[in-house]
Amino acid sequence: MYRYLGEALLLSRAGPAALGSASADSAALLGWARGQPAAAPQPGLALAARRHYSEAVADREDDPNFFKMVEGFFDRGASIVEDKLVEDLRTRESEEQKRNRVRGILRIIKPCNHVLSLSFPIRRDDGSWEVIEGYRAQHSQHRTPCKGGIRYSTDVSVDEVKALASLMTYKCAVVDVPFGGAKAGVKINPKNYTDNELEKITRRFTMELAKKGFIGPGIDVPAPDMSTGEREMSWIADTYASTIGHYDINAHACVTGKPISQGGIHGRISATGRGVFHGIENFINEASYMSILGMTPGFGDKTFVVQGFGNVGLHSMRYLHRFGAKCIAVGESDGSIWNPDGIDPKELEDFKLQHGSILGFPKAKPYEGSILEADCDILIPAASEKQLTKSNAPRVKAKIIAEGANGPTTPEADKIFLERNIMVIPDLYLNAGGVTVSYFEWLKNLNHVSYGRLTFKYERDSNYHLLMSVQESLERKFGKHGGTIPIVPTAEFQDRISGASEKDIVHSGLAYTMERSARQIMRTAMKYNLGLDLRTAAYVNAIEKVFKVYNEAGVTFT
């Protein structure tokens, strides 16, 4: 696999002119790289001056609205994959009819199916009344239930929830999670409300969603997002199970990200950040990509910067630190800190819990200037959308941008990064760890049993029986006078013998999902000569998978 990736990537670095004059050599190179009998590629291809990336979308406005931004990325991927989708249709239709069918389904995929806008009153603790605004967007129901988080923010808007819902559709498709995309937002600043008021808002919002059919284990399953967590998810589950879902045995599957006592799953809190780590790991250990960037594989000598020290930023920082990378700067909305010798994530977490801010952390200095432009190897924007724009993209010094947040890079900035040979690991792949583990939690709730409970003891006993069998076989063959030949397992194997916990199973499933999806993205990038344009490769994969569902299910009532 590594040789194939490395050699085929040489072609993706070729400029458009070189590719145009060597179309016959393209197939030869890919076949040769796979080990198939074919003529070796011409050396000139490997020496092309510039990489090639998708030019399917013309220049757009510098900072488009969020939903149009996602639509632009979708259009880029759709224009590249359209011919293949037409070619793969096995019908008796003419070429024109096939193309019309493909374009029709692509038009079905693109827009948001449903958007619910809500307003409801609450009485605050001081006796005053306030009207709360909220939204829930369901982008696609090609798979049900729909899946997407609920965020509490004063920046919530219809455009934002539509954009985030569409990203969820493509995100689920990229990592093969069988959900449609959705997103919700409540337009409040949670810091301005008491816990009692937040509970009122959350429970009332749940009831409004339920009345309109926008929540349910098989309909629409929310999850935590910005400024929400286990507590809010527990309120949602309890509200649904106590009212509209009181006859439904699967009622607690109406939401994920719950506390363990309410049907949650071990490993969900850190899932998105752990997914970010695994996503970076898959690309940073790929020698062919690192050679393009002029870097060595592995985390050992790498520095990184995190923008946003929330759930995603903290856990991303924690895992990268654990595997040898050094965090030299952390930024939040109220300021940034910097230490070239490294910042310990546990110490910074404890300091923030105690003081409410990272500013004043004794083992780092205040950082003047934009944290996004700090000198580092890996930049992790884990805050909010549209942080990297046309104006600051030329000054970004990182070689790898790992999108922990949703939509942190605008199309114009994305184009600049590609021209500057900077690798952007896209959001729809990189932060899919959360929805992946949410899927595991949803399955756990439907099965009504935790992972491994039925097999823990059986597997542990089987391992011990295997060791005893090996020991007895050795003693019969080599033992003298009935002497024993003890079999001593290593510490790592001893941990395995003791049986995998639910967290071990979740972590293993997440790592496998991220690795498999990364390989799919790499293969697609090579197939379409996209070079470092991993975002378009991810969108191509997502579009192909969603298209296949619509095409094979058939389009009803048209």
Swiss-Prot record:
Cellular-component GO terms for this entry: cytoplasm; endoplasmic reticulum; mitochondrial matrix; mitochondrion
Outcome following mutation: residue 318 to T: In HHF6; diminished sensitivity to GTP
Transit peptide among keywords: yes
Pfam families the record matches: ELFV_dehydrog (PF00208), ELFV_dehydrog_N (PF02812)
Residues where N6-succinyllysine is found: 68, 84, 110, 162, 183, 191, 200, 346, 352, 363, 365, 390, 415, 457, 477, 480, 503, 527, 545
Location of Phosphoserine modifications: 79, 128, 227, 384
GO MF entries: ADP binding; ATP binding; glutamate dehydrogenase (NAD+) activity; glutamate dehydrogenase (NADP+) activity; glutamate dehydrogenase [NAD(P)+] activity; GTP binding; L-leucine binding; NAD+ binding
Amino-acid positions noted as binding ADP in the UniProt annotation, renumbered to this chain: 450, 516
CDD domains: NAD_bind_1_Glu_DH (cd01076)
Modified residues (Phosphotyrosine): 135, 512
Catalyzed reaction equations: L-glutamate + NAD(+) + H2O = 2-oxoglutarate + NH4(+) + NADH + H(+); L-glutamate + NADP(+) + H2O = 2-oxoglutarate + NH4(+) + NADPH + H(+)
Keywords, alphabetical: Acetylation, ADP-ribosylation, ATP-binding, Disease variant, Endoplasmic reticulum, GTP-binding, Hydroxylation, Mitochondrion, NADP, Nucleotide-binding, Oxidoreductase, Phosphoprotein, Transit peptide
PROSITE patterns associated with the record: GLFV_DEHYDROGENASE
Transit peptide range per the UniProt entry: 1-53
PTM text: ADP-ribosylated by SIRT4, leading to inactivate glutamate dehydrogenase activity. Stoichiometry shows that ADP-ribosylation occurs in one subunit per catalytically active homohexamer.
Free-text activity regulation comment from the record: Subject to allosteric regulation. Activated by ADP. Inhibited by GTP and ATP. ADP can occupy the NADH binding site and activate the enzyme. Inhibited by SIRT4. Inhibited by HADH.
Location of ADP-ribosylcysteine modifications: 172
Quaternary assembly: Homohexamer. Interacts with HADH; this interaction inhibits the activation of GLUD1.
Disease: Hyperinsulinemic hypoglycemia, familial, 6: A form of hyperinsulinemic hypoglycemia, a clinically and genetically heterogeneous disorder characterized by inappropriate insulin secretion from the pancreatic beta-cells in the presence of low blood glucose levels. HHF6 is an autosomal dominant form characterized by hypoglycemia due to congenital hyperinsulinism combined with persistent hyperammonemia. Clinical features include loss of consciousness due to hypoglycemia, hypoglycemic seizures, and mental retardation.
UniProt-recorded name of the protein: Glutamate dehydrogenase 1, mitochondrial
Species this chain originates from: Homo sapiens (Human)
